[in-house]
Amino acid sequence: MLHLIGFDKLYSYNMVKLALLEKGVPFTEV
């Protein structure tokens, strides 16, 4: 909760990753 901006970016990143996984798109973590 201290770094709201960083948390928001991480949240968005996770949402994108979940969306790709749902579509069955291969996703490699960087």
Swiss-Prot record:
Compartment(s): Cytoplasm
UniProt keyword terms in alphabetical order: Cytoplasm, Transferase
Reactions catalysed according to its record: RX + glutathione = an S-substituted glutathione + a halide anion + H(+)
Keyword Calcium included in the entry's annotation: no
Signal sequence range: none
CC annotations in GO: cytoplasm
E.C. numbers: 2.5.1.18
Alphabetized GO MF terms: glutathione transferase activity
Chief subcellular location: cytoplasm
Family that this chain belongs to: Belongs to the GST superfamily.
Record text on subunit structure and interactions: Monomer and homodimer.
Free-text function comment from the UniProt entry: Conjugation of reduced glutathione to a wide number of exogenous and endogenous hydrophobic electrophiles.
Protein's recorded name: Glutathione S-transferase
